[in-house]
Amino acid sequence: MKKHLNTNVGEGSKKRMEVCSEPEPDTPIKNVDIPFFEQWSEFGAFPVIYENEYCLIREVSYPLDYQHGKYTFDMLPQIVKIWNESDLKHPLSAKGFETNQMFFFDTETTGLGGGAGTSIFLLGYAFLEDEHIKVRQHFLPRPGFEIPFYKTFLEKVNYETLVTYNGKAFDWPQVVTQHTLLRQHLPKLPNFGHFDLYHASRRLWKNKLDRVKLSVVEKEVLGFERKDDVPGYLAPIIYFDYIDRKNPEAIFKIMKHNEWDVLSLITLYI
């Protein structure tokens, strides 16, 4: 545990899903005011404090036999093994990589089109560790706290392959831009390979589906239908409302939306 990490996690859990906890903090949490701290803890998020700034991190763990739509996560190691045993040349081939190097990544931002003025407020990713699929999310509680937000993210990124849904054009360039602005404060940006499942989905299903948005592909192809989901286009409005009122209730729904996104990237890759 790095020196600047403060950690307090609630006891919440679900039958087939475990909210992961971290060790006790090294620095007193009382040094930083965290609005609605109890609600964050109950949701399974803990603060990470760095020089009087902080971000919030949530981690959830799923067993490999967990079924997400039509598929279970234990199929991922099988697929990676097949790629490694195959000589087939394909843009999505995982040949040369291990399953625990796959990094299924998505963000939520303050704007849907990218460009100037758009900032990431949630970094979410799923990965294989200790025979579980883990989802880790880093949340930016306010503009100006980007250093702990990106620092903790980059400190935990040890994966060589980035898997996204249109992330090559949108999500990762946003990270690169922010890193450029803060690079003297942040770890070196890792080198990633990049598997973008959006382009493969367009080639496969653009003539069969009305749209190839991830939520549509989930429902029509992967057999996963979201319940009580918050549409992604509402994320900027919800985040700005959170900045104003600090109540995280609606943010929790955005984080669940993001969690489903990264889990669906796994089953889509399968």
Locate predicted features.
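N-terminal accessory regions of nucleic-acid-interacting proteins
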Residues: 1-98
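Short, conserved acidic/polar surface loops in the N-terminal third of protein domains
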Residues: 68-69, 113-118, 175
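Conserved RNase H-like, two-metal-ion catalytic cores of nucleic-acid enzymes
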Residues: 89-161
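Short hydrophobic "helix-edge" motifs at membrane interfaces and signal-peptide entry regions
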Residues: 96-97, 186, 250-251
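Acidic active-site catalytic centers that drive phospho-/nucleotidyl reactions
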Residues: 106-108, 171, 196, 261
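Active-site-proximal flexible loops/turns
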Residues: 113-115, 173, 203, 268
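Conserved DEDDh/DEDDy metal-dependent 3′-5′ exonuclease domain
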Residues: 130-221
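Acidic, Mg2+-coordinating catalytic module of metal-dependent nucleases/exonucleases
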Residues: 209, 214-270
